[in-house]
Structures are given as structure tokens and as C-alpha cells.
Regions:
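Conserved catalytic core of the tyrosine transesterase superfamily
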Residues: 1-185
Length: 185
């Protein structure tokens, strides 16, 4: 009897070894966040970059959550941010004091100036983070900010916005946080 079906067609190849994501040390995160402030607190772009990176590290948010964040998603009095995640899932995450201070400084000094730069007839009033032209910041801009700030901080390992998310989770777990709780953040 001849075999007419390829019995090996249903067999799946074993998965290759997955690599662990790049994670910054606590010292590298500190250097990154310090480097974001280089250029002075009066420059609205510097103020925005510092607030953006503090926000991303403090919340462990995805880039899309940072770019999609609106002013009314932030409660600085309660130290809480409302994030809209994948699948339109909303979650509340705590905002640390460093992030709250950086966001407050940005809102008090930088954001208004960036909003005034808009050439649009109706300025962007909702977005938390604005680009140099007063519009909602893009994913690409966030990537460029993270990369440029990492270079200024002397960080040589691969660095991208998601690295902050991985670092956030890793540092929480290293600090004793429950893995299930971190997964929900």
C-alpha cells in the first residue's frame, strides 16, 4: 500500500529559543531621566520630553498609550493615570511623585507654549503630549526622543520605547511586586 498523505504536514517545528527583552538597570533609567532634563527647564520641548519619559517609566505604558493620553486622563491630585490599552481596555495606574512633578512642570510651563505653535484653526486641547508644532505627538517622535535621550545618557544597549515598559515591570518585580499584579499594569 502506498501512502498518499504527507503525515509530517501536521507536525510543527519546535520554537526557537526566545530571547529576553532588553531591560535598563535602575542606574541607566536614572541617567536616561536625568538626560531628558538637559537643556533647561524653560525649554518647552525639554519639559515635554522629561514629562513623557517619566510618565512612560512610571506607568509602564505602551507608546500608543502615551501618544493617546489626554489631559483628562491624568489626575495629579490622586496620582493616577487612565490608560487606554490594546482592545480599548481601560486601566488605572498609579503615577509616582517624580512623574507627577515632571508632568506638572510641563503643564505649567511647556505645554501651553507648544499648543500656541499650532497652525491649526482649532488647537489641540485634549492631548497630554504635544509635538513641536502643537499637535498630538506621534509614535515616531516618541521613538526618536527615547533614542536621542539614551544617546545623551550614554546608554549603549538597544533602546526603544518598549524598553521602558520592560524595565518598569522588571524593577517592580525585583522590588517585590507580585507578578500577577505587574501583568495587569
Amino acid at each position: 500500500h502506498a501512502v498518499t498523505a504527507d503525515v509530517s504536514a501536521a507536525v510543527k517545528a519546535p520554537k526557537g529559543a526566545s530571547t529576553l527583552p532588553d531591560v535598563l538597570t535602575v542606574d541607566e533609567v536614572t541617567r536616561l531621566l536625568d538626560a531628558a532634563a538637559v537643556g533647561g527647564s524653560t525649554d518647552p520641548v525639554v519639559s515635554r520630553d522629561k514629562a513623557l519619559l517619566e510618565f512612560m517609566y512610571a506607568t509602564g505604558c505602551r507608546v500608543s498609550e502615551a501618544t493617546g493620553a489626554n489631559l483628562d486622563d491624568i489626575d495629579l491630585d490622586e496620582h493616577i493615570a487612565r490608560l487606554m490599552g490594546k482592545g480599548s481596555k481601560q486601566r488605572l495606574v498609579p503615577l509616582g511623585s517624580y512623574a507627577c512633578r515632571a508632568i506638572t512642570a510641563y503643564l505649567n510651563a511647556g505645554r501651553g507654549e507648544l499648543e500656541q505653535r499650532s497652525s491649526a484653526k482649532i488647537p489641540e486641547r485634549r492631548a497630554l503630549f504635544l509635538n513641536k508644532r502643537g499637535k498630538r505627538i506621534s509614535r515616531q517622535s516618541v521613538w526618536e526622543i527615547v533614542k536621542a535621550t539614551g544617546e545623551r545618557a550614554g546608554i549603549t544597549k538597544p533602546l526603544h520605547p518598549h524598553t521602558l515598559r520592560h524595565s518598569f515591570a522588571t524593577h517592580l518585580i525585583q522590588g517585590g511586586a507580585d507578578v500577577r499584579t505587574v501583568q495587569e499594569l
